[in-house]
């Protein structure tokens, strides 16, 4: 069958690479795709924006697309799934009403409270003065979040009152995130270890993907600004078998059942960004309605099952008929970013040193990369993600670092400590 993947990042390159391996996939189209997806076997880019829903629907009808997988959040929040379903097309992702779990942080916090799902204490604000009063009552450290979508950058972890007040003013009166910041959520700072827990949902059945841990801060030792993610590894040792079952019981099933009870049946990938507290309790920091980026890259390297089959079963409400199979090795991905990211960054620098041919257990997934006159040049903040499998997280990390060193362009940078928590655990054994 023909398959369509919507999006143009490193995550979509990883999804396209995995989908193309399926015997069920004759041809894989990526809209709009990037220079990485263009190079994959059986894969073709289509020049349609990820948010141009009428054009995507028409393309899917013209090419007789048997399955569509949505990569990024923006099309989900504006209703791409609803439009495809109305046209009788099979698509894996949540409908617009269910995608509010990512589209509005205030919606999510209120939903969690209604269903007694553990999360940080919080309040929502649309006016500056009441928000400032609340900040002064609660003290720091404290977290200020823009309500809507802000490409992973709308969260400020404020260590001083001044930082917190500036964030509130920037969002509510300074319009730092436009419409996304017209309402803010202020919540308590949770001190634990973060983990990404991604599952597939068919409305009622849930199939967990491998656990992972992302690294949000731009600098080593988790310093500097928040980003969309500077690297990730899988599995995350903080998620022990016991904590895994707690997450399913206390977070995932109550969320899926709660959404269904409220008339927003959830299908698609559901990504719970969690804080694992020192006592082992998982608390929800955020939900995303899609696979994470960069978590997808190391997770896809470990997935042994046919992703197309999993998605088709999920679309048909039959996820209980399949169990995903995973490589027991660890995988780790390091993002190589353009100078200046996550603020204003340079574009157009020529990239050299990319592997000429496929290497077993290693893969470079391209993201912000364009082709110009036969050369690959930087075209985004997060340019690519070097990913490797290893017998341990340390081994995967060392392989990925070696791969990263070979790839060059002017001003490129990356974190050399991705996976440090897991590596420390391994060294203590």
From Swiss-Prot:
Classification via Gene3D superfamilies: 3.40.50.20, ATP-grasp fold, A domain (3.30.1490.20), ATP-grasp fold, B domain (3.30.470.20), Phosphoribosylglycinamide synthetase, C-terminal domain (3.90.600.10)
- Which pathway does the protein contribute to? Purine metabolism; IMP biosynthesis via de novo pathway; N(1)-(5-phospho-D-ribosyl)glycinamide from 5-phospho-alpha-D-ribose 1-diphosphate: step 2/2
Residue positions binding ATP: 135-196
Domain ATP-grasp, residue spans = 109-316
A GO BP annotation? 'de novo' IMP biosynthetic process
* Keywords carried by this UniProt record: ATP-binding, Ligase, Magnesium, Manganese, Metal-binding, Nucleotide-binding, Purine biosynthesis
Q: Does the keyword Ligase apply?
A: yes
Q: Which cofactor does it need?
A: Mg(2+); Mn(2+)
Question: Its family?
Answer: Belongs to the GARS family.
List, alphabetically, the HAMAP family matched.
Answer: GARS (MF_00138)
Q: Sorted alphabetically, which NCBIfam families does this protein's record hold?
A: purD (TIGR00877)
Organism annotation: Haemophilus influenzae (strain ATCC 51907 / DSM 11121 / KW20 / Rd)
The Swiss-Prot or TrEMBL record annotates one GO molecular function as: phosphoribosylamine-glycine ligase activity
- Residues bound to Mg(2+) are 286, 288
Q: Which domain of life is it from?
A: Bacteria
Reaction equations catalysed: 5-phospho-beta-D-ribosylamine + glycine + ATP = N(1)-(5-phospho-beta-D-ribosyl)glycinamide + ADP + phosphate + H(+)
Q: How is the cofactor bound?
A: Binds 1 Mg(2+) or Mn(2+) ion per subunit.
User: SUPFAM superfamilies, alphabetically?
Assistant: Glutathione synthetase ATP-binding domain-like, PreATP-grasp domain, Rudiment single hybrid motif
Q: Which PROSITE patterns match?
A: ATP_GRASP (PS50975), GARS (PS00184)
Q: Which InterPro entries does UniProt cross-reference here?
A: ATP-grasp (IPR011761), ATP_grasp_subdomain_1 (IPR013815), PreATP-grasp_dom_sf (IPR016185), PRibGlycinamid_synth_ATP-grasp (IPR020561), PRibGlycinamide_synth (IPR000115), PRibGlycinamide_synth_C-dom (IPR020560), PRibGlycinamide_synth_C_sf (IPR037123), PRibGlycinamide_synth_CS (IPR020559)
Q: Which Enzyme Commission number(s) are on file for it?
A: 6.3.4.13
This chain belongs to the protein called Phosphoribosylamine--glycine ligase
**Which residue ranges does UniProt annotate as crossing the membrane?**
none
């Amino acid at each position: 069958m023909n398959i369509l993947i919507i999006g143009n990042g490193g995550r979509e390159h990883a999804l396209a690479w995995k989908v193309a391996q399926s015997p069920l996939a004759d041809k894989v189209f990526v809209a709009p795709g990037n220079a990485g997806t263009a190079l994959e076997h059986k894969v073709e880019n289509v020049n349609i924006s990820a948010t141009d829903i009428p054009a995507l629907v028409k393309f899917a009808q013209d090419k007789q697309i048997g399955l569509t997988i949505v990569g990024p959040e923006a099309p989900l929040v504006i209703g791409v799934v609803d439009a495809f379903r109305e046209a009788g097309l099979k698509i894996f992702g949540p409908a617009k009403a269910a995608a509010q779990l990512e589209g509005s942080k205030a919606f999510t916090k209120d939903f969690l409270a209604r269903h007694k799902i553990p999360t940080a204490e919080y309040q929502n604000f649309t006016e500056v003065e009441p928000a400032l009063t609340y900040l002064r009552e609660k003290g720091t450290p404290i977290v200020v979040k823009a309500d809507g979508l802000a490409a992973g950058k709308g969260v400020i972890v404020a260590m001083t009152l001044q930082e917190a007040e500036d964030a509130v003013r920037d969002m509510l009166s300074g319009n730092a995130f436009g419409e996304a910041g017209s309402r803010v959520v202020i919540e308590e700072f949770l001190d634990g270890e973060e983990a990404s827990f991604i599952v597939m949902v068919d409305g009622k059945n849930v199939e967990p993907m491998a656990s992972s841990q992302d690294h949000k801060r731009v600098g080593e030792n988790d310093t500097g600004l928040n980003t969309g993610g500077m690297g990730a590894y899988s599995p995350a040792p903080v998620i022990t078998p016991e904590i895994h079952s707690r997450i399913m019981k206390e977070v995932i099933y109550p969320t899926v059942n709660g959404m269904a009870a409220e008339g927003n049946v959830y299908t698609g990938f559901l990504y719970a960004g969690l804080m694992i507290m020192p006592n082992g309790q998982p608390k929800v920091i955020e939900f995303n309605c899609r696979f994470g980026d960069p978590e997808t890259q190391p997770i896809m390297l470990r997935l042994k099952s046919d992703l197309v089959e999993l998605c088709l079963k999920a679309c048909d409400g039959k996820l209980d008929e399949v169990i995903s199979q995973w490589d027991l090795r660890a995988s780790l991905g390091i993002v190589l970013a353009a100078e200046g990211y996550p603020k204003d960054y340079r574009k157009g620098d020529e990239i050299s040193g990319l592997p000429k041919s496929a290497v077993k257990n290693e893969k470079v997934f391209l993201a912000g990369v364009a082709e110009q006159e036969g050369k690959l040049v930087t075209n985004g903040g997060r340019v690519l993600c070097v990913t490797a499998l290893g017998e341990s997280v340390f081994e995967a990390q060392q392989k990925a670092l070696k791969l990263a060193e070979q790839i060059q362009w002017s001003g490129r940078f990356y974190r050399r400590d991705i996976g440090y928590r897991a590596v420390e655990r391994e060294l203590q054994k």
